[in-house]
């Protein structure tokens, strides 16, 4: 980790650029033994707990159109990591990820 950083202990978040199919990448990784998990937050105001607040337009404030937040929500996923990962495992994950986006 970089100095003064606090990386996640359980996963590495990946956000696909425009033109990269997240579902294809996730399926490719999973089929090659690299486990993934979907992002579990994203644009919070689209979560069910905001249903009533959206109807009344009360209880929260939105600044801007949140297009970046929507992009992250729709195009991000986690790959699992843990402190005991070997360089060989990390290299394998990187190789599979590169292959997935080049396909």
Stretches with model-predicted labels:
Residues 1-103:
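PLP-dependent aminotransferase class I/II
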């Amino acid at each position: 980790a970089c100095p003064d950083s606090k990386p996640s202990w359980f996963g590495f978040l990946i956000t696909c650029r425009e033109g990269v199919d997240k579902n294809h990448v996730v399926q490719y990784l999973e089929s090659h033994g690299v486990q993934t998990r979907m992002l579990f937050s994203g644009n919070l105001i689209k979560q069910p707990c905001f249903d009533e607040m959206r109807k009344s337009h009360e209880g929260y404030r939105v600044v801007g159109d949140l297009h970046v937040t929507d992009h992250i929500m729709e195009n991000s996923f986690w790959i699992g990591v843990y402190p005991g990962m070997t360089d060989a495992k990390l290299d394998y994950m990187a190789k599979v990820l590169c292959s997935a986006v080049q396909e």
